[in-house]
Amino acid sequence: MRVIHILDHSIPLQSGYAFRTQAILKEQRALGWETFHLTGPKQGPTAATEEEVNGWHFYRTPPPGGILDGVPGLSELELMGEIAYRIEQAARRVRPHLLHAHSPVLSAIPVLRAGRRLGIPVVYEVRSLWEDAAAGNGTREGGLRYRLRRGIETWALRRADAISTICEGLRGDIVARGIPAEKVTVVPNAVDVEEFSMGGAPDPGLKKQLGLDGVLVLGFIGSFYAYEGLAVLLRALQQMLAQGERVRVLLVGGGQQDAELKRLASELGIENQVVFAGSIPHGEVQRYYDLIDVLVYPRLSMRLTELVTPAKPLEAMARGRLLVASDIGGHRELIRPGETGTLFKPGDPEALSAAVRALLREPARWPGLKAAARRYVETERSWQASVARYADVYARVTQPHRRA
């Protein structure tokens, strides 16, 4: 089986998107499949149109950089044209059995175009819906731009030969658009259970360096988007400090809310109790998990978060950490309340602080929660089990005479 994966971006860039991609590729290679990899212009300028990264070969698509650059609508058309051209170049060289497009839809549309021209079936993997990702970054839900993006997404979904997606929430939304249920397969986010072993003791040197000795540490590791609700965590911290708790918050990562969160910490008078560790190499992340007593995932309730499951809680569960998370659809699909974690009312700092305090009052439950969380990812959320689901999808679309 020869597959070209068409991606928004990849390593060496670090993101949840890139890490999921690498996990998929690693497991597909273990199944004996030949994988080839092409990124769109969002990868940014590269030294060459083909490059090796950590032993993986990538076809790159240079950014257009023409007169249409930055012109709404026209720049997207130019971008998709460049991707389609590169796909056809790579496909004629590789002669794949199928093309596997990974969202956003700006990657899927040129793949559909190239697939039809070359007679190659297309699998479209939806990791998030274009209109909802935009709404999470400032586009008004239900507005004209939102509805246009939704229409384009649905158009692409109808034309793919098969669809994979990362969670049941997204699958339900796709089927509600009139896409046949049998066409949509969930290949859920997972975790490398060998890489993320059951947690160890905190590194005393790192703990001291960050000023976390002798305190309870609440933490978050990930990207600082507005929908992550990290302001709720800071307000909950203020409440806990006012009640005499010896507690700190450790935020690891960065993003568009970085400056706003630092401003809020200062405004609340808790800047000395919040540690902004910044972005860290992926290889260091387990050391930071081990510093945190309770992982907190305070995502706000909106369409994006109700539909889409995050990946980071799975890392915490694999590491055997305690976690509390907001009671939204994406978290409910991952966390079994009282068994593998604790849920609280989204957007409510008081509910968050109450959930943490309740957890701290019952230390006898901690070993059971940690063990159940680890067992869940081992049995249901390993990459080996997840990626095996592609076998049936690929077999269906590559069988002869699949089109009427």
Residue ranges and their predicted role:
Residues 337-338, 342-349, 358-364:
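Conserved acidic donor-binding segment of nucleotide-sugar-dependent glycosyltransferases
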Residues 4-6, 212-237:
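Conserved donor-binding/catalytic core segment of Leloir-type glycosyltransferases
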Residues 351, 358, 365-380, 389-392:
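A short, well-ordered alpha-helix in the C-terminal region of glycosyltransferases
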